[in-house]
Regions:
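Hydrophobic alpha-helical segments with strong N-terminal bias
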Residues: 1-4, 62, 112-114, 118-119
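Short, flexible, glycine/charge-rich loop motifs used to bind or transfer phosphoryl groups or to couple energy/partner
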Residues: 8, 14-18, 63-66, 121, ...
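Early extracytoplasmic/lumenal segment of secretory-pathway proteins
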Residues: 18-84, 209-210
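Short, low-complexity disordered leader/linker segments with a strong preference
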Residues: 1-25
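Extracytoplasmic ligand-binding site segments that recognize negatively charged/polar headgroups
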Residues: 71, 76-213
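Glycine-rich, phosphate-binding/catalytic loops in enzymes
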Residues: 1, 44, 91-94
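Conserved phosphate-coordination/catalytic loops
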Residues: 5, 56, 139
Length: 213
C-alpha cells in the first residue's frame, strides 16, 4: 500500500539545497517508519542534512502539502493518494534512470493501476490491514469483520482514523471488493460505519498498538 522508494534519498538530494554549503533533504513520512539513528548515520555518511517530518494519515499529509505551507523532496503517500496528488499536479515525475535498483523490485508491485508507468512513485512498502485483539479479553475465534460490529464489545473497539481502511473494513464485512467504485456499495459501507459508531471507543492511528501493550 505504501509507496516511494527509500533509496530515493540518494537521488533526491540533488534537488534540495544545491546552492547551500550544506545540502538539505526534506522528507515527510509516516510515524514510526525510520529510526532517528538511521537518519543520523545517513547525515554522517553523506554530509546531507535531513529535515524529517511525520504524519499520521494520508489525509493529514495531503492537507499540509495542499495548503502550500510546506514543500518536501520525498513523501510517502499510499496508493490511492498518489493518484489524487498526481491528478492535482502535486507530484513531480521521477527519472528512473537515476534509480538503477528499480529493476530489482518484485514485479508484482510495479505498474499498478494508481501509477501504471511508475513515473510518480516507486514501491517502498506493502502490507495488509487486519484485526488486532487482546487474547486475554477476546476468547472467541476472530475470523470475520463482524466482530467489529458486535454490541458486546461496545466502547472497547478502536477503529483506524483512515477513510480508506475503515471503509475497507465495512466493504469486506458486506462482502464487497475493497476497490469497489459502485456508489450503492460505498453508500452501504458508509451506513454500516455510522451504525457502528456508538460501539467505537475512539478512531486512532498509532495509538492502537500502544493500548495493546
Amino acid at each position: 500500500m505504501f509507496v516511494i522508494l527509500m533509496s530515493l534519498l540518494l537521488v533526491t538530494l540533488i534537488l534540495s539545497g544545491c546552492k547551500k554549503d550544506t545540502p538539505t533533504l526534506y522528507v515527510y513520512n509516516w510515524g514510526d517508519s525510520i529510526d532517528e539513528d538511521v537518519l543520523g548515520e545517513f547525515e554522517k555518511e553523506t554530509g546531507i542534512k535531513v529535515v524529517y517530518d511525520t504524519f499520521a494519515t494520508n489525509e493529514d499529509m495531503y492537507v499540509k502539502i495542499k495548503s502550500g505551507g510546506s514543500s518536501y523532496d520525498l513523501i510517502f503517500p499510499s496508493d490511492y493518494m498518489i493518484t489524487r496528488m498526481r491528478d492535482e499536479g502535486m507530484l513531480e515525475k521521477i527519472n528512473l534512470d537515476n534509480i538503477p535498483n528499480f529493476k530489482y523490485i518484485d514485479k508484482r508491485f510495479v505498474g499498478q493501476d494508481y501509477d501504471p508507468t511508475n513515473e510518480y512513485s516507486v514501491p517502498y512498502m506493502w502490507g495488509t490491514m487486519g484485526i488486532m485483539y487482546n487474547t486475554t479479553m477476546v476468547h472467541e475465534p476472530v475470523d470475520s469483520w463482524d466482530i467489529l460490529w458486535d454490541p458486546k464489545y461496545r466502547k472497547e473497539i478502536l477503529m483506524l482514523d483512515s477513510q480508506r481502511d475503515s471503509i475497507g473494513a465495512a466493504l469486506l464485512k458486506l462482502g464487497y471488493s475493497l476497490n469497489t467504485t459502485d456508489p450503492q456499495e460505498l453508500e452501504e459501507a458508509g451506513r454500516l460505519l455510522k451504525e457502528q459508531k456508538p460501539l467505537v471507543l475512539a478512531y486512532v492511528v498509532d495509538e492502537a498498538k500502544d493500548k495493546m501493550v
